[in-house]
């Protein structure tokens, strides 16, 4: 893959290496949103079928990205909404604890903590190893060591949101299946930019906000719920998710049944005429790019930066345990953090500080000068 910067509207003097914060919209996604506004401006253009047809197409496209059937996909407004549906349907009559990671994204932690509090369960927080060598492998081992027949659920992200650490999701998923625990995963920081197969990993629920690596707008997202959830209780009772919703002439013939699969977990008003076309266009482009090609592009792009970091005593996770589109590095004592952040800002190099980690998150809109600008700024801050 070559640079796709021409599909975006980023100025040349902006070095935006911060897709994990929020992705820029492609021009085509902007256009879809503008067309959606025009459609909403003239509702006579909307038929009853329009409330459902594009939503089904979006589910189909997302299902292909994560290797899941479309009828097990739901449209959600946020990752926290999708997580709540997943966590609230964990069977509460077995087990005595749930597991999360230390320094996990707040919504993931809060959702798990609230469920544990409500159901009188312990929340086990798995800390990272204190040593940096072999850290990712040892962290996965710590998770596995805490899992047993009394584990209700393991709730974690596909990669750690602060530094891109990869966990062995396959081993964790297999052990969850073995001990009959739910495996609930937040894919917001990797799905769309890194390949994933929910069946192979034995994931029970996967939630993704769209505004990061799915390249979509804010306030919409997608979730996968396995068949274990098909009789669960949704966050809300939207008429659009009921079995007779497509026939507008019969809506007051109230029914108990939902549409099949995971449809009950759709947010109300999921057929947003502005956001949904934008997300549809973004998913189409991701499918054309392919997540594995995005990883390869980012891996080649960041190689000069990784070489510089390695040569100058910066710590970062070793290649096979770290994502290429999102990774973090620790500063050596020779670098003044506050001075560095100030110079990054003045040079229009956009990265994030998460804890003690400088997080770099490139994508296909980035080019070599973006990486070079970061390297030059780091060089200028060595004492």
Describe the function of each predicted region.
Residues 1-383:
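Pyridoxal 5′-phosphate
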């Amino acid at each position: 893959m070559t640079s796709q910067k021409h599909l975006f509207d980023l100025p040349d003097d902006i070095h935006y290496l911060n897709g994990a914060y929020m992705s820029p919209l492609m021009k085509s996604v902007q256009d879809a949103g503008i067309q959606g506004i025009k459609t909403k401006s003239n509702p006579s253009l909307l038929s009853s079928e329009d409330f459902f047809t594009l939503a089904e197409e979006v589910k189909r496209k997302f299902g292909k990205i994560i290797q899941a059937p479309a009828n097990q996909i739901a449209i959600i407004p946020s990752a926290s909404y999708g997580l709540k549906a997943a966590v609230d349907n964990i069977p509460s009559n077995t087990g005595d604890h749930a597991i999360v990671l230390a320094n996990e994204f707040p919504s993931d932690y809060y959702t798990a903590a609230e469920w544990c509090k409500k159901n009188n369960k312990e929340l086990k927080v798995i800390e990272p190893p204190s040593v940096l060598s072999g850290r990712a492998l040892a962290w996965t081992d710590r998770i596995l060591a805490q899992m047993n027949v009394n584990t209700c659920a393991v709730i974690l992200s596909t990669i750690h949101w602060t530094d891109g650490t990869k966990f062995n999701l396959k081993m964790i998923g297999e052990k969850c299946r073995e001990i009959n625990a739910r495996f609930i995963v937040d894919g917001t920081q990797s799905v769309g930019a890194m390949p994933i197969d929910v069946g192979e990993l034995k994931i029970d629920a996967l939630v993704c906000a769209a505004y990061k690596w799915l390249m979509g707008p804010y306030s919409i997202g997608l979730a996968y719920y396995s068949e274990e959830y098909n009789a669960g209780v949704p966050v809300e009772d939207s008429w659009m998710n009921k079995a007779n919703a497509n026939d507008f002439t019969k809506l007051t013939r109230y029914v108990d049944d939902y549409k099949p699969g995971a449809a009950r977990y759709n947010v109300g008003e999921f057929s947003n005429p502005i956001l949904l076309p934008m997300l549809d266009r973004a998913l189409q482009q991701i499918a054309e790019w392919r997540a594995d090609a995005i990883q390869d592009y980012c891996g080649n792009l960041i190689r000069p930066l990784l070489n510089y970091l390695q040569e100058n005593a910066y710590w970062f996770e070793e290649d096979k345990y770290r994502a290429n589109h999102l990774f973090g590095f620790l500063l050596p004592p020779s670098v003044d953090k506050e001075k560095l952040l100030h110079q990054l800002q003045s040079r229009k190099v956009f990265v994030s500080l998460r804890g003690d980690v400088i997080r770099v998150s490139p994508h296909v809109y980035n080019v070599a000068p973006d990486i070079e600008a970061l390297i030059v700024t780091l060089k200028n801050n060595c004492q």
